[in-house]
């Protein structure tokens, strides 16, 4: 019997069930413990990045090769002949999908991954980020990192700090964790960057408890996971940014009363919202989180391309 992810488009984290999320996390752990370079042998995966990327692209391409696949593609779509000749995205997808077994794509346009899935001739499309919309593989590595450090995905106290309005990673992670039981969220952000109403409405409908705070110091002792994000300078004038930035910088001193199991996560790149003295604490986990991205993407690719898993 094929797993439910076999040949499935991975466009939005909301379209994955709790059971599918658990299967990906479990498979990532198995591949971390016991690498398997034969899982997608003879499969070719397109890695098509229509906007520049470093971490996501390298992570996907490493994952593909570690489980036996081959990669074709590009990392700056604006410089390809596709763009220079004015080919539509739909036609580009039709052409590229005729060469490959799966299609990993990042695109600056919201909804581009959904569009690609409609023109890929049945080839599964994996969304590696479409504008400010979705970035499901980041959420998968976040879930795996949480499970690795906490041993569970339920009964967690999780704070999201910084830019909660525009940060697609926090939207998707909140949606994913809402599928699990008895998780409690703390939203810490300036009013101008608060979690969007539609996310809060989804959480209300799901019965998920959450609280809103303007500073993080008071919530840190309550947490299992502290998920930091960058407050983007371009959203504020200079004086307002200086004030807001200083309120959302995590230092080692902030962690003095933290639970022993607390882990600090960050989708990276960080700028100055986590000081380097945090790196030396046992709570820092953001660089291990990056490594976990390879295992999570190995698991995702293996399940999408291997019927027997």
UniProtKB/Swiss-Prot annotation:
Record Pfam families: OTCace, OTCace_N
Domain of life of the native organism: Bacteria
PROSITE patterns listed in its UniProt record: CARBAMOYLTRANSFERASE
The UniProt record lists the keyword Transferase: yes
Enzyme class: transferase
Keywords linked to the UniProt accession: Pyrimidine biosynthesis, Transferase
Entry EC no(s): 2.1.3.2
Pathway connected to this protein: Pyrimidine metabolism; UMP biosynthesis via de novo pathway; (S)-dihydroorotate from bicarbonate: step 2/3
Residues that bind L-aspartate: 85, 168, 230
InterPro entries membership: Asp/Orn_carbamoyltranf_P-bd, Asp/Orn_carbamoylTrfase, Asp/Orn_carbamoylTrfase_sf, Asp_carbamoyltransf, Asp_carbamoyltransf_Asp/Orn-bd
Reactions mediated catalytically: carbamoyl phosphate + L-aspartate = N-carbamoyl-L-aspartate + phosphate + H(+)
The keyword Transferase is assigned to this record: yes
Signal peptide feature range: none
Function description: Catalyzes the condensation of carbamoyl phosphate and aspartate to form carbamoyl aspartate and inorganic phosphate, the committed step in the de novo pyrimidine nucleotide biosynthesis pathway.
Oligomeric form and interacting partners: Heterododecamer (2C3:3R2) of six catalytic PyrB chains organized as two trimers (C3), and six regulatory PyrI chains organized as three dimers (R2).
Protein name in the entry: Aspartate carbamoyltransferase catalytic subunit
Organism: Vibrio cholerae serotype O1 (strain ATCC 39541 / Classical Ogawa 395 / O395)
Gene it is expressed from: pyrB
């Amino acid at each position: 019997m094929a797993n439910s992810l076999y040949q499935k488009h991975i466009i939005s984290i909301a379209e994955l069930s709790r059971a599918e999320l658990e299967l990906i996390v479990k498979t990532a752990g198995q591949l971390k413990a016991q690498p398997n370079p034969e899982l997608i042998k003879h499969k070719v995966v397109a890695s098509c990045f229509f906007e520049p990327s470093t971490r996501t692209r390298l992570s996907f391409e490493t994952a593909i090769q570690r489980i036996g696949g081959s990669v074709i593609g590009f990392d700056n779509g604006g410089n390809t002949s596709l763009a220079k000749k004015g080919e539509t995205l739909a036609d580009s997808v039709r052409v590229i999908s005729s060469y490959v077994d799966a299609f990993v794509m990042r695109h600056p346009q919201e909804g581009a991954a959904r569009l690609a899935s409609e023109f890929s001739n049945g080839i599964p499309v994996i969304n590696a980020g479409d504008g400010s919309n979705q970035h499901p593989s980041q959420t998968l590595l976040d879930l795996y990192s949480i499970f690795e450090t906490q041993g569970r995905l339920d009964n967690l106290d999780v704070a999201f700090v910084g830019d909660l309005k525009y940060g697609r990673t926090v939207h998707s992670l909140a949606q994913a964790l809402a599928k699990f039981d008895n998780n409690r969220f703390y939203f810490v952000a300036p009013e101008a960057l608060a979690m969007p109403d539609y996310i809060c409405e989804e959480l209300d409908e799901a019965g998920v408890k959450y609280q809103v705070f303007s500073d993080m110091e008071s919530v840190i002792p309550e947490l299992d996971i502290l998920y930091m994000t960058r407050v983007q300078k371009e959203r504020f004038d200079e004086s307002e940014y200086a004030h807001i930035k200083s309120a959302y910088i995590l230092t080692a001193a902030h962690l003095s009363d933290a639970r022993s199991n607390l882990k600090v996560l960050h989708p990276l790149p960080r700028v100055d919202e986590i000081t380097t003295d945090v790196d030396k604490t046992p709570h820092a986990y953001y660089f291990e989180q990056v490594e976990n991205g390879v295992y999570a993407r190995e698991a995702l690719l293996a399940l999408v391309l291997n019927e027997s898993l």
